[in-house]
């Protein structure tokens, strides 16, 4: 990887506050692109539009999904946009490349019953459960990203206003409220989780050694909770974010409020959460439609 690509990744990390997971995706995209350059004996600074079209064909020949191809092309377009800010002689070969539209999908989310089962798993006040519960509570109660969670400092928690200040994408701060259950889990954690009482830093969420937890560590914790919970097959940080948004909208929250809570710049990004479960659809239908039920039915 050359110095331009390394500087590009560093800019995404420092200035745009991208998560480890997102940065890894960008890095993988660049590595694959570099393999193509080497294979075709091409150079980054002389790469042309026709080469970009050939690269698009190359990705299709590797049987990648449209979403993956779209992301990889977007990564390279953004790379060249960054490079153009440093060198006026650089031309973006991907700027006019028509790449496939992303496949539409409905975000996965957990049912309320599944969430209750997960919280039941970590309700006993062991040292590990104190930490695991605060992770689960914060992700579900606030809908924050895992990259935002691992960077929360103890001073970011406001018990007076019942909320937390997080640093989101683009280094933008936002305040997100939390409820009584989340507050209680944080208080219990701060009071009884021994590693946090003896650590020499301000990070809120720690591993069992008293070190600031990583994004990978959070995923490991959630996977472990799932293994201990009957009837729940999968949970990950972004699924909890989907669940947070879906449950709010299902209970009548307006889209603009959810947009603000999630830290989305565009309302269209939040719009993908407006799906509701079949159970919720049926409940609304039965309660709202005048001919949904006969008079003797309840």
UniProtKB/Swiss-Prot annotation:
One of its GO terms (biological process) is DNA transposition. It comes from the Bacteria. The keyword Cytoplasm applies. Residues 1-84 form the Core-binding (CB) domain. Disulfide bonds: none annotated. Residues 105-286 form the Tyr recombinase domain. The keyword Cytoplasm applies. This is Tyrosine recombinase XerC. The active site is at residues 145, 169, 238, 241, 264, 273. It comes from Staphylococcus aureus. Coiled coil: none annotated. One of its GO terms (cellular component) is cytoplasm. Belongs to the 'phage' integrase family. XerC subfamily. Pfam families: Phage_int_SAM_1 (PF02899), Phage_integrase (PF00589). Keywords: Cell cycle, Cell division, Chromosome partition, Cytoplasm, DNA integration, DNA recombination, DNA-binding. Site-specific tyrosine recombinase, which acts by catalyzing the cutting and rejoining of the recombining DNA molecules. The XerC-XerD complex is essential to convert dimers of the bacterial chromosome into monomers to permit their segregation at cell division. It also contributes to the segregational stability of plasmids. InterPro entries: CB, DNA_brk_join_enz, Integrase-like_cat_sf, Integrase_catalytic, Integrase_recombinase_N, Integrase_SAM-like_N, Recomb_XerC, Tyrosine_recombinase_XerC/XerD. The gene is xerC. GO terms for molecular function: DNA binding; tyrosine-based site-specific recombinase activity. Its main location: cytoplasm. PROSITE patterns: CB (PS51900), TYR_RECOMBINASE (PS51898).
């Amino acid at each position: 990887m050359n110095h331009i690509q390394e500087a590009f990744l560093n800019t995404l990390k420092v200035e745009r506050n991208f998560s480890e997971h997102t940065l890894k995706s960008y890095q993988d995209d660049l590595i694959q692109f570099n393999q193509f350059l080497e294979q075709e004996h091409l150079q980054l600074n002389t790469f042309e539009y026709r080469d970009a079209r050939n690269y698009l064909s190359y990705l299709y020949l590797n049987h990648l999904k449209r979403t993956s191809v779209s992301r990889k092309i977007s990564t390279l377009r953004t790379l060249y946009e960054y490079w153009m800010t440093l060198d006026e002689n650089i031309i973006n070969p991907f700027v006019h490349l028509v790449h496939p539209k992303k496949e539409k999908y409905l975000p996965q989310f957990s049912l309320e019953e599944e969430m209750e089962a997960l919280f039941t798993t970590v309700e006993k006040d062991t040292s590990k459960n104190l930490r695991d519960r605060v992770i689960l509570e914060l992700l579900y109660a606030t809908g924050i990203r895992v990259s935002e969670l691992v960077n929360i400092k103890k001073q970011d928690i406001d018990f007076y206003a019942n909320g937390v200040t997080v640093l989101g994408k683009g280094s933008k701060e936002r305040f997100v409220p939390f409820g009584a259950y989340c507050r209680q889990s944080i208080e219990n954690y701060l009071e009884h989780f021994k590693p946090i009482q003896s650590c020499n830093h301000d990070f809120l969420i720690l591993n069992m050694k008293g070190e600031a937890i990583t994004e990978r560590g959070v995923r490991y914790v959630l996977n472990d909770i799932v293994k201990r919970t009957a009837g729940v097959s999968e949970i990950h940080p972004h699924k909890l974010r989907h669940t947070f948004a879906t449950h709010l909208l299902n209970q009548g929250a307006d889209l603009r409020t959810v947009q603000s809570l999630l830290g989305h710049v565009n309302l269209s990004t939040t719009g993908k959460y407006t799906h509701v479960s079949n159970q919720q659809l049926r409940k609304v239908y039965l309660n709202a439609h005048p001919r949904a039920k006969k008079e003797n039915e309840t």
